[in-house]
Amino acid sequence: MRVFVTGVKGQLGYDVMNELEKQGLEGIGVDIDEMDITDADQVNKVIKEAAPDAVIHCAAYTAVDAAEDNEEICRKVNAQGTENIAKVCEELDIKMMYISTDYVFNGQGERPWEPDDKREPLNVYGQTKYEGELAIEEHVKKFFTVRIAWVFGVNGKNFIKTMLNLGKTHDHLTVVNDQTGSPTYTYDLARLLVDMIQTDKYGRYHATNEGICTWYEFACEIFKQAGMNVSVAPVSSCLLYTSPSPRDCS
């Protein structure tokens, strides 16, 4: 099986490529240098030349707060870029897996979110990822939409690395304590995605590790495990963030 993977310089795409190799599958990885997903002609050319059996689309604009000031580029990447890929998958009649986000919900539920719950994004990032979901649903019959949250891995930037770096230069930090989620290791997630892409169980899914916590609780555990003496104080997200964010994405 030949699997085409976008965003391979990111933490999830990197682990997906490694997992494909472990399972004896052929992975064809690209990032923006090899294929600009906002360029429809280039997307068409590169994917058709690769002739894959499936596409795992990990590439995305993920800077949530920055998206509020860069709506056009965020939409080009997350919505138009996804649609460009979806149209090629439709033409080739191949599987497509789209990595989406918990930000397509409003975060105000009182129970864990189900894959088919109403999508009601609160910010630009969530809205553009929602538009990406609509694009794949419109164009691709064999689609997987996999919503992930709070990911961390060896490659790329993530919350753990940010906290550890801040802990080297700060004795005291404030971290939001009114957003809950499930920290998810991209190594585990990649194994699930590669297993899924080999099936025909199409549809929408949520994929995270078990357990829930707040960002504040996560930060406290990070410093505890690292043996770093850093004081962490809880704070409301409205004091730190410029964009509306879901409070509960468990």
Language model: regions and residue ranges:
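NAD(P)H-binding glycine-rich loop region in Rossmannoid oxidoreductase-like domains
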Residues: 41-77
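Catalytic helix-loop patch of NAD(P)-dependent Rossmann-fold dehydrogenases
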Residues: 76, 81-84, 104-146, 151
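Mid/C-terminal beta-alpha module of Rossmann-like enzyme folds, strongest
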Residues: 192, 199-240
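NAD(P)-cofactor binding segment of oxidoreductase domains
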Residues: 69-97
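NAD(P)-dependent short-chain dehydrogenase/reductase
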Residues: 134-181, 187-188, 195
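Adenosine-cofactor binding site in Rossmann-like domains, unifying the SAM/SAH pocket
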Residues: 27-42
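Single conserved hydrophobic/aromatic residue that forms the stacking wall/gate
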Residues: 241-250
